[in-house]
């Protein structure tokens, strides 16, 4: 999709851009694949804020996405390419030959009328899903499983892709978008291709209101709060932090502290960390 640039007719329109939606073939989603979605506004079951800066925004329906792609050897035809308000990637409605309808993440280059299939014997074509052990070295993939049968969990955002680097016993070496090289079981499935809508990250919202439409609330700096609200708060005028290092609102170290569990069992599956040269 292309980027639409607006003329600076108002302050809010100045520098504003959006996607032109030329790729979409319908604006009406498949009703049988919609479920209602209650707004949580960042609260948990106790009503306490667990995720800040969430709330408001346009009401949405959730689209049921098939991340498992486990209907083996059953062909599906791509019927539509659609917008999904719940994710950055676009989605595609596919009709299987046995009558089942499903939504999948739309990879770059997927077109209406194209036929896709899942299974170990599937061809290496955009949109086909097969075990990592059956995918040639160098192939770009997305929607990667971490456990066989659990459904794709990695590489699902707009424009994202991972590359198959090789096979090592029962594991497949995969380079993720971050640069991390990881071993994943060869029986885990992945979909061939790069996730579409790769220009999503180039959009300039232009005004605060567009963030509010998305359900994103303002992010207030700690230094402009009161001392009872944040460790950085208080003082006269533009006061410095007043501590050895910046802190979170709850007094824990911020900016640079490693938060990964040092005893994570998956450490043995990481061949190269994302921050290593």
From Swiss-Prot:
Q: Which InterPro entries does the entry link to?
A: NA-bd_OB-fold, Rib_uL2_dom2, Ribosomal_uL2, Ribosomal_uL2_bac/org-type, Ribosomal_uL2_C, Ribosomal_uL2_CS, Ribosomal_uL2_dom3, Ribosomal_uL2_RNA-bd_dom
Q: Which key words are in the record?
A: Ribonucleoprotein, Ribosomal protein, RNA-binding, rRNA-binding
What Gene3D superfamilies would the database entry show? 2.30.30.30, Nucleic acid-binding proteins, Ribosomal protein L2, domain 3
Residues that span the membrane, as ranges: none
**What highest taxon heads this organism's lineage?**
Bacteria
Transmembrane keyword on record: no
- Which GO BP terms, alphabetically? cytoplasmic translation
Q: Which Pfam families does this chain map to?
A: Ribosomal_L2 (PF00181), Ribosomal_L2_C (PF03947)
Q: MF terms per GO, please?
A: rRNA binding; structural constituent of ribosome; transferase activity
Name the PROSITE patterns on file: RIBOSOMAL_L2 (PS00467)
- The UniProt regions of compositional bias labelled Basic and acidic residues, in chain numbering, are 264-277
Annotated region (Disordered) at 219-277
GO CC terms in record? large ribosomal subunit
Known role: One of the primary rRNA binding proteins. Required for association of the 30S and 50S subunits to form the 70S ribosome, for tRNA binding and peptide bond formation. It has been suggested to have peptidyltransferase activity; this is somewhat controversial. Makes several contacts with the 16S rRNA in the 70S ribosome.
Family membership, please give it: Belongs to the universal ribosomal protein uL2 family.
Subunit description: Part of the 50S ribosomal subunit. Forms a bridge to the 30S subunit in the 70S ribosome.
Protein name, please? Large ribosomal subunit protein uL2
Query: What is this protein's gene name?
Result: rplB
């Amino acid at each position: 999709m292309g980027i639409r640039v607006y003329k600076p007719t108002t302050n809010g329109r100045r520098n504003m851009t959006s996607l032109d939606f030329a790729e979409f073939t319908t604006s009406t989603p498949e009703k049988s694949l919609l479920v209602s979605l209650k707004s949580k506004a960042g609260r948990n079951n106790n009503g306490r804020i667990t995720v800040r800066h969430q709330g408001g925004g346009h009401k949405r329906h959730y689209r049921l996405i098939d991340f498992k792609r486990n209907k083996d050897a059953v062909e599906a035809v791509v019927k539509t390419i659609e917008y999904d308000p719940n994710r950055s990637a676009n989605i595609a409605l596919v009709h299987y030959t046995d009558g089942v309808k499903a939504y999948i993440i739309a990879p770059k280059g997927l077109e209406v009328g194209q036929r896709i299939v899942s299974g170990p014997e599937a061809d290496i074509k955009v949109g086909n899903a097969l075990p990592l052990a059956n995918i040639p070295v160098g192939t770009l993939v997305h929607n990667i499983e971490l456990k066989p049968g659990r459904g794709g969990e990695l590489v699902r955002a707009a424009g994202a892709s991972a590359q198959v680097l090789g096979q090592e016993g029962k594991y497949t070496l995969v380079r993720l978008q971050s640069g991390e090289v990881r071993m994943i079981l060869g029986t885990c499935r992945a979909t061939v291709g790069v996730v579409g809508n790769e220009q999503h990250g180039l959009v300039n919202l232009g005004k605060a209101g567009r963030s509010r439409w998305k359900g994103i609330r303002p992010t207030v700096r700690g230094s402009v709060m009161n001392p009872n609200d944040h460790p950085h708060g208080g003082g006269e005028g533009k006061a410095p932090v007043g501590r050895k290092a910046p802190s979170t609102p709850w007094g824990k170290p911020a900016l640079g502290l490693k938060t990964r569990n040092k005893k994570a069992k998956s450490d043995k599956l990481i061949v190269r960390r994302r921050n290593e040269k």
